[in-house]
């Protein structure tokens, strides 16, 4: 049975905080791989608020290249409509019956779990992994495994603003992603 961490998000753009979080979960939970899974239309975000899927996929490929245990999973981009975790997990379990899935969420998403579609069924299908900051307490009635990750204060929205305002992004995003963003003139307006 392969142990696979699923890391969903818009990754618009992917940054070093994403990579740090994935790497910490990979090693602390002794997983075989982390699959980065870009969302089609996350239910909690506006439809036109992020870059084209092809750009996000290409940036993710660049960000995770060279890390053998990091993979790209595009199952949510293959479907139409909103990306609900329950539907995605059902598809993944059908496609990969010999895999055990660990769904990685940030501390900020833990409080929203009661609002997730089919959450009571979902917690029986996968293991949720809550990524938290050292010393940050999270209360939830759901069975979560918590992983402490070093503090790295960066977000994709911060990076989009910095790029738009021509501020430096050094050490915040992988160099290959930075080049891709510049060559494709992403986030300039």
Swiss-Prot record:
InterPro entries the UniProt entry points to: Cyt_trans-like, NadD/NMNAT, Rossmann-like_a/b/a_fold
The enzyme's E.C. designation: 2.7.7.18
Catalytic reaction list: nicotinate beta-D-ribonucleotide + ATP + H(+) = deamido-NAD(+) + diphosphate
One GO biological process term: NAD biosynthetic process
GO MF terms, alphabetically ordered: ATP binding; nicotinate-nucleotide adenylyltransferase activity
Matches recorded under Gene3D superfamilies: HUPs
Pathway membership: Cofactor biosynthesis; NAD(+) biosynthesis; deamido-NAD(+) from nicotinate D-ribonucleotide: step 1/1
Disulfide bonds: none
Record's keyword terms, sorted: ATP-binding, NAD, Nucleotide-binding, Nucleotidyltransferase, Pyridine nucleotide biosynthesis, Transferase
Protein purpose: Catalyzes the reversible adenylation of nicotinate mononucleotide (NaMN) to nicotinic acid adenine dinucleotide (NaAD).
Recorded family membership: Belongs to the NadD family.
The name this protein goes by in its record: Probable nicotinate-nucleotide adenylyltransferase
UniProt source species: Bacillus licheniformis (strain ATCC 14580 / DSM 13 / JCM 2505 / CCUG 7422 / NBRC 12200 / NCIMB 9375 / NCTC 10341 / NRRL NRS-1264 / Gibson 46)
Origin organism lineage: Bacteria, Bacillati, Bacillota, Bacilli, Bacillales
């Amino acid at each position: 049975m392969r142990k696979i961490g699923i890391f969903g998000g818009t990754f618009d753009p992917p940054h070093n905080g994403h990579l740090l979080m994935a790497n910490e979960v990979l090693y602390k939970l002794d997983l075989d791989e982390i699959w980065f899974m870009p969302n089609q239309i996350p239910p909690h975000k506006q439809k036109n608020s992020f870059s084209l899927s092809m750009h996000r996929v290409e940036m993710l490929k660049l960000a995770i290249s060279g890390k053998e245990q990091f993979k790209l999973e595009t199952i949510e981009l293959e479907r139409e409509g909103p990306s609900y975790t329950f539907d995605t997990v059902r598809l993944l379990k059908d496609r990969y019956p010999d895999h055990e899935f660990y769904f990685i969420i940030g501390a900020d998403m833990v409080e929203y779990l009661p609002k997730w579609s089919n959450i009571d069924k979902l917690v029986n299908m996968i293991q949720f992994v809550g990524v938290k900051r050292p010393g940050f307490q999270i209360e939830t009635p759901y069975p979560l495994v918590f992983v402490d990750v070093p503090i790295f204060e960066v977000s994709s929205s911060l990076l989009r603003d910095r790029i738009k305002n021509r501020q430096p992004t050094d050490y915040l995003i992988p160099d290959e992603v930075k080049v891709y963003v510049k060559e494709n003139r992403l986030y300039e307006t």
